[in-house]
Amino acid sequence: MNSLLLCIPFAGLLLCIAVMPLVKPEWWEKHQALAVIVWSLLFIIPSIVLNGAGETTETVLECIVNDYLTFIVLLFGLFCVSGNITLEGNLAGSPAVNALFLAFGTLLSSCIGTTGASMLLVRPMIKMNSWRKNKAQIMIFFIFMISNMGGCLTPIGDPPLLMGFMRGVPFFWSLHLFPILIFNMILLLIIFYLIDKKQYRKDIANGLRPDISKPGVDIKVEGLHNIVFLVAIVVAVILSGTLPSLPMFQDAAGNVLGITIYKSVKLTFPAMIEIAIILLAALLSFKTTNEKIRTQNHF
């Protein structure tokens, strides 16, 4: 029961993140750090009372070192590398084009993460629908499909799968969700197409037309060499799950070697290798990419 009660601050923090930007956006913008501190203290203080300061410190450090650190480094790497790739084109935001774009982005999310796919595709999606007035549904489905649902096939895609992988779940285990993903993707695409087609007809009836500079389809991708760095990040994540099983990374008792932070909390050598590879990939991405690309991405 006590363990369940200690979950309340986490649920409260998630609700704040989801609701406050909509209800009190200005307050949230200024005080989100304070909200995180308050909810964290609402966990830490009762935990100290129930379990003692030592166990609470160990629990908090375990979460920071073995969960949060590698997770945030992965997001940082995907965000940086994806920000150095730009997708340009003269596509017009019709229902069919938007649906195909959403389908592509949904499948891409499991390859470069929901963060990476969203970073790469949100600007082209906004640009090709900039001529339209009735378009709120486009970004809603973008968030549903590309920023959330699409990452369900690999630990690269979604944070919960990454944490499962860090706890020993096989990297490709979640591929069995592929039929479910396809079913839901098709269902959502049908719903989206019907809604978008109705709104599209309203825009056309109001005299709105896409501004396409030249006939045909002209799509240009810059910064493609960054795919190498995305692959490096994927390899780093896979290594973090496979290296701990190698004898060279274990002591005589079979424990994974690393730097002890506090009691049983340890930053393992495989985790350090993963972090180093991801940070190196992000650094090389910045060093080898023209700044113009980042400017185009508003990055």
Q: Which ranges hold each PLM region?
A:
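Interfacial loop-to-helix junctions that mark the boundaries of transmembrane helices
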Residues: 1-6, 27-35, 56-69, 171-180, ...
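Hydrophobic core segments of alpha-helical transmembrane domains in multi-pass membrane transport
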Residues: 9-20, 39-50, 75-83, 182-194, ...
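C-terminal ends of transmembrane helices
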Residues: 15-28, 78-93, 126-129, 192-198, ...
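Transmembrane alpha-helix boundary signature
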Residues: 25, 44-67, 76-94, 107-120
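Cytoplasmic-side transmembrane-helix entry/capping segments in multi-pass membrane proteins
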Residues: 29-40, 65, 69, 91-103, ...
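Hydrophobic transmembrane alpha-helices that form the pore/transport pathway of multi-pass ion
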Residues: 96-150
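Juxtamembrane and boundary regions of transmembrane helices in multi-pass small-molecule transporters
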Residues: 134, 153-154, 172-221
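Transmembrane helical segments that form the transport core of multi-pass membrane transport proteins
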Residues: 230-299
